[in-house]
């Protein structure tokens, strides 16, 4: 019921969110490093 369609939502969500967080944190780190 809920568990049957939950993976089909979580898999692309995790696959998109984690790279986005990684790129965002890396971008912020590089920007702060260049400013200082």
Swiss-Prot record:
Record's protein name:
Photosystem I reaction center subunit VIII
GO cellular component terms, A-Z: chloroplast thylakoid membrane; photosystem I
Q: Where in the cell is it found?
A: Plastid, Chloroplast thylakoid membrane
The record's listing under NCBIfam families reads:
PRK11877.1, PS_I_psaI
Q: Which residues cross the membrane?
A: 7-29
Supply the gene name: psaI
Q: Name one GO biological process term.
A: photosynthesis
Per the record, membrane topology reads: Single-pass membrane protein
Q: Tell me the keywords, alphabetical order.
A: Chloroplast, Membrane, Photosynthesis, Photosystem I, Plastid, Thylakoid, Transmembrane, Transmembrane helix
Q: Tell me the function of this protein.
A: May help in the organization of the PsaL subunit.
What domain of life does the native source organism fall in?
Answer: Eukaryota
Please give the HAMAP family that the UniProt record associates with this protein.
PSI_PsaI
Family that this chain belongs to: Belongs to the PsaI family.
């Amino acid at each position: 019921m809920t568990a049957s369609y939950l993976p089909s939502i979580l898999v692309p969500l995790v696959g998109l969110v984690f790279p986005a967080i990684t790129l965002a944190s890396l971008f912020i780190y590089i920007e702060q490093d260049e400013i200082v």
